[in-house]
Structures are given as structure tokens and as C-alpha cells.
Amino acid sequence: MADYWKSIPKYYCKYCQIFVKDTPFARRSHEQTYKHQDAIKKVMDDIHRSNLLRQELEKNLSIPKSATATTASAVSSELASYEKPKKEHPKLRPSKKKATLDDWDIPTSSTETDTISTTHTSYIPTLLAKQEENEETKETTTNKNESLPGTSLKRNREIIEKEERSSFHFRVKPKNLDKVPKLAENEGNKSLESKESNENKVVFKKKKSGKLRTKSSLKEYDQS
């Protein structure tokens, strides 16, 4: 058998790198396999890649060095001249400064005002001046009222009368003790009348039905 297998002719597949029977059926079946087709595709890709590299090398050799230098300088000049566009931010309006207590000028004494120039003007807030005036008017009115004792008495009397008028609707009425025994007598008379009426009432008994009569008669018969 070994001699027989050795006698069969074989060929070497350079794509798959294996030996195959040199018969038309065996060769056709091997070429139709996925492994053989994938190996052929890889070889063709390598050939195509090597051809592209060779073409690039030929182009680089054909271009002179002076041309490459000029292109490089042109590119560098373009990059140097390029500047990023500046962003234009919107202009912000300056905020108005609010007036504070530190900005107000306080008036000084007569000795200090002599040295200050005539153009300098002092400013006092109007609210403080008004409050001081109101306090002064209150003090004057209180002093006047204390000096006139008669007026204060009249005023107190008027206030008391007004309070009495306002509390007129809420006065408590006094109880009359004379009416209390009369109410007790009336209640006693009513209770007596109710007792008499209960005594005079006639009580009507309900008639028994036929079944109840028979039951009661049977009970009486058994007892006898």
C-alpha cells in the first residue's frame, strides 16, 4: 500500500503551502475550498500594497529638491501669516455707584469751617431733619399739656365717657330675686297637675290574638 500511495503524483500549492493529489478532481476540490481562496486574496493584497509603495518612491525621486524646498517655505509662510480671529465681546455699561452714608458731608464746627473754601457745600439728609423736627414738636406739646392741668382732667373725663358709651351694649342686667320663688311655685303646680293627669288616664289593654288565647288556656289547664 505504501508503494501505491507513493506512486500517485502530487503537486505543491504555493498559496496554501501544502501537497495535493495531482488529479483533476482533487485539484478542483482544493481550489474551491475557503482556505485556498483566502490565501490567494492575502497574496494579491500584498502585491497591490508593494506596487503602491513603489509608485510613491518613483514620484519622490522624480521631484527635484528645490521644488520641495519652495513648497515647504510657502507652507511655513502661510502658517506664520495665519492669525486666529479675535472674539468681539459686547461692551459692558459701567454700573452707577449707589450713594452711601460715607459719601455724605457732615457739617463741622465754626473753627473748622473757616479753613474750608467757600465752594464746598455740606449735605444733610432730609429724613433725619424731619425726624428731629417731629421729636421737637412732640416735646413742646407734652410740656404745654403738663402746664395746663384743667385740660388734662377734661380730656380724661371725655375718654371715660367714650369708654362707657362703647361698653353700653355689654352691660350685665341685675337679677330680680322676687321672681325666683314665683318660678318655684309654678314648677310645683305643674308637677302636681302632671301627676293628677297620669292618675286620671285610662289604660286600654290590647286584645290578644287567637294563638295567644289558646296558649294561655292550655297553660291554665295544665296548672289545674
Swiss-Prot record:
Location of the protein in the cell: Nucleus, Nucleolus
PROSITE patterns for the chain: ZF_MATRIN
Compositional bias of kind Basic and acidic residues: 175-199
ZnF (Matrin-type) ranges: 11-42
Biased composition (Basic residues): 87-98, 203-216
Keywords: Metal-binding, Nucleus, Zinc, Zinc-finger
Matching InterPro entries: Matrin/U1-C_Znf_C2H2, Matrin/U1-like-C_Znf_C2H2, U1-CZ_Znf_C2H2, WBP4, Znf_C2H2_sf
A Gene Ontology biological process term: mRNA cis splicing, via spliceosome
Composition bias type Low complexity, residue spans: 67-80, 108-122
A GO molecular-function descriptor: zinc ion binding
Subcellular location, principal: nucleus
Entry GO CC: nucleolus; nucleus; precatalytic spliceosome; U2-type precatalytic spliceosome
Chain residue ranges for the region called Disordered: 67-158, 172-224
PANTHER family the UniProt entry points to: WW DOMAIN BINDING PROTEIN 4, WW DOMAIN-BINDING PROTEIN 4
Protein name per the record: Uncharacterized protein C18H10.07
Organism: Schizosaccharomyces pombe (strain 972 / ATCC 24843)
